[in-house]
């Protein structure tokens, strides 16, 4: 299902910052595809290169790290509107994996075109930096939950976050 950025239902959500028609057009121009994946599909492989950045259009996913003994630690959950794969695009390889928790739809943005767009529209680059900082604050909260909260407090914090 191909969706134009101009018709994206996520833009109507009050949680998202409005962007100019010019910025929206530029994003729509570089968007390459709309990918549909089933629950359990690997979106990003830990240690792998990823030439794309995605926006989660629908469904849920989670970011995780696999421990040496095979256990997985969920780092956080990704919901519609979240940027997926930014870390993997910034470094040579992803430091974590991302898996679809439910069936998902992703808008695919080629990394090189995104970087070029940031040079043309620094306001968008700032917005993405803000998203990265916001994500970091969630990770800080998750670390606090794991290290210092009781099981009941961890459950409550997760519900509030979602």
Question: Model-predicted segments: where are they?
Answer:
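Cyclic nucleotide-binding regulatory module and flanking cytosolic helices
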Residues: 1-39, 83-84, 89-90, 120
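Cyclic nucleotide-binding regulatory domains
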Residues: 15, 41-103
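Residue-level recognition of specific faces of alpha-helices
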Residues: 26, 52, 74-77, 97, ...
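A generic structural signal for short hydrophobic patches within well-formed alpha-helices
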Residues: 83, 114-115
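Conserved active-site beta-strand element of glycosyltransferases/polysaccharide synthases
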Residues: 107
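Polybasic "coupling" helices that flank or enter modular domains
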Residues: 119-162
């Amino acid at each position: 299902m191909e969706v134009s950025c101009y018709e994206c239902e996520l833009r109507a959500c009050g949680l998202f910052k409005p962007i100019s028609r010019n910025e929206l057009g530029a994003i729509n121009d570089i968007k390459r595809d709309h990918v549909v994946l089933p629950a359990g599909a690997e979106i990003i492989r830990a240690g792998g290169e990823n030439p794309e950045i995605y926006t989660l259009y629908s469904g849920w996913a989670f970011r995780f790290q696999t421990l040496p003994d095979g256990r997985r630690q969920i780092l956080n959950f990704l919901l519609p509107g979240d940027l997926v794969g930014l870390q993997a695009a910034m470094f040579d390889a992803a430091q974590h994996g991302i898996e679809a928790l439910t069936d998902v739809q992703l808008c695919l943005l080629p990394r090189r075109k995104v970087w070029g767009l940031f040079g043309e529209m620094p306001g968008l680059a700032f917005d993405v930096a803000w998203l990265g900082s916001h994500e970091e604050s969630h990770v800080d909260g998750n670390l606090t939950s794991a290290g210092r909260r009781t099981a009941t407090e961890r459950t409550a914090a997760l519900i509030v976050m979602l």
